[in-house]
Structure formats: C-alpha cells, structure tokens
C-alpha cells in the first residue's frame, strides 16, 4: 500500500458512485467505501471498485459488543479490502476480537479515535475531556489491543506519532477553509508534514468532478 491518498466514495446513488469511480485512477489513489455507499449499494460497491483495480478502505466504523464485531469482521474479511475501521471506544476486548477475526488475512484494522466533526465543546460534553485527551486515551487503548492503526484528525497526528508506532488515517482534509461539518481540519500538505500515512479526501476532490475534466488537475 504505497498510495497515501484515499478518495471517499460517499454516494448512495449508483450513477453518481459509478461516475466518481470512473474518473479516478487506481494508480494514483485508493478509495474509501463507507456506510453511505455500502448500506445502499451493498457489497457490489466494494467489488466494483476492486474490479477496476483499486485498493479499498472499508470504513464502516463497527461498534458493538465484542462477539458481534468479531462476527461482522469475519463476514467482511472475504471482500477484497486492504483496511477497515472499528470504533476504538468499543473497548479492548472488542478491538482484540476484531484483530483475531482477520489474523489469517492481510487486512489492517484501524480504530476511530474521535470523529473529526467533533469540536472540543462536543468532546467535553460527550467524553468529559478535550479532543486531544480523548484521542490520547484511544491511542493507548489501540496500542494495548494490537490493532494496526488509528483514524484521527490531522490536528492529533503528533500525539499518535510521538506516543506510538500506529499507522494513521486522517480525514478532515481540506484544500481551504470551508463551512461544512468538519471541525478539526488541515490542508493535505500540513497533514503530510505532520506524518499522516493515509489522507482521506472526499468532497474537495469529488466536487471537482463536476467542474473539472479530471480530478488529477
């Protein structure tokens, strides 16, 4: 997995999903299939991307009791995916069960720390601590549970890199300041400079597909 850009395919409409996929190059990027596409278009959304040669990040953010997550991962691991997500806050046992379920594959498990849509006021209300404190607690839990990496905002990359050997996936990548639902963001260059292994970029790329001949521009 040498490609560091992951383009988010967050489309529930088959025509729009295909349109985005057709304009991307599997030699330049991976693709993320999340709950929007997977829940509406099913496993075929993953299989179609795989047939076009893409490495796939399945981002379903599984979060349930340990046995349920283990069975869910077992049911998904036969898909042609490279990485998948669970919620780190599901606890050590849940994380360990997810790793055990893919032990005979090359799939990597990433734990979501704190959603990039959450501001400090949100994390204070939900977790009774600042976003960085919540992420640090999840880094420690991820390390203890032997998962492969974490999903964090680019603003917390230094916390991960200075306190663990975990791989990092960073959503919240913006080319400029936008009035949208992301709270903790950075530009691609800032995220790379801070050590991100994989950058998830959705709307900044997919919105260009309707105004530019090619997103590679």
Where are these regions (language model features)?
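Active-site beta-loop-alpha junctions enriched in small/polar residues
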Residues: 8-12, 34-38, 63-65, 89, ...
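Conserved anion-binding
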Residues: 68-72, 81-145
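Conserved small/polar residues in nucleotide/adenosyl-binding loops
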Residues: 210-217
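Hydrophobic faces of well-ordered beta-strands that scaffold small-molecule active sites
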Residues: 5-8, 31-33, 56-60, 84-86, ...
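Active-site-adjacent beta->alpha loops and helix N-cap segments on the catalytic face
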Residues: 37-49, 65-71, 88-103, 154-166, ...
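Active-site-adjacent loop and "lid" segments of alpha/beta metabolic enzymes
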Residues: 111-135, 159-194, 198
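Alpha/beta enzyme core
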Residues: 20, 26, 78, 127-149, ...
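Glycine-rich phosphate-binding active-site loops on the catalytic face of alpha/beta enzymes
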Residues: 86-90, 194-209
